[in-house]
Amino acid sequence: MNAIEIRNLTKRFGEKLAVNELNMTVPVGSIYGFIGENGSGKSTTEKMICGLLIPSSGSIKLFDKDYTDPSIRDGVACLIEAPGCFKSYTVWNNLMLQATNLGIKNKEEEVRRVLKLVRMEGAASNKYKNCSLGMKQRVGIAMALLGKPKLLVLDEPINGLDADGMRIVREILIDLTTNHGCTVIISSHILGELEKIATHYGIIRQGKMIREMTAEELESNCPIYIALKTKDMNKTKLVLSSKYNRVEEDESGYLRVYDLVSTEEVVTFLYDNGIIVNEIMTDKISLEEYYINLMDKKEVR
């Protein structure tokens, strides 16, 4: 069973087509990285999934039920834009107020549970206005987790966070999907962070889904390569191309060898041809580079 199945989803705002016959499949228990440029339709799609916007056409199924089914709506939570917190209230009081609004029984127990999940047990008495940006994001996630949702939709939850803040959010999301039966959709422009946690990806452009893939499929499309520099790069490229199948120059001025060979073999081969290597390393194509290459090549019709 899939957590989300979207077919031919369209949303218009007057003459503007924000989402254009979009298809999306999100497996249960996955962390789905939703990627796209500003204005590509990510937030609009997320708001329709969460019931905050009504589609112009198309269908949304959540756990095999129509997204409007009351029996499934309580299992969907989101953090889109800033959490609705009272600045002068403590973290505890904000969460208690939200638990009351949701009609949750045993509110104190539930608030303690979500505070533990987001690692903020020791910050419950802090006023929200005095929290760091990273802590405020975790308060927002805690509010979304009240009531034990099965599906959590997060829009740019790590923007503006420092490295430690991003690490904590990463660990929280992995814990939610691994140990608490939650499925997570997360959109972010920080693709290096998404690559560390996502199990599935969807890439949207101009309101259309142009690529969906698993982390394993991404890995197979992001090969390892050897990058190197010499004093005479033109000669080096000619020499390397005489032996290896795929040799390319990148934007940083490095030559890349994509054949499955060792750095030692490449250095020896070049030395035997009178070329000394100044720099050499092994690397792989990142999600960010894959995405940029895809955007350059893909034409949406």
Regions found by a protein language model. Give the residues of each.
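ABC transporter nucleotide-binding domains
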Residues: 4, 11-186, 191-205, 209-211
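Short, charged/small-residue-rich alpha-helical element at the C-terminal edge
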Residues: 224-294, 301
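Conserved beta-strand-loop-alpha-helix hinge in the C-terminal portion
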Residues: 208-229
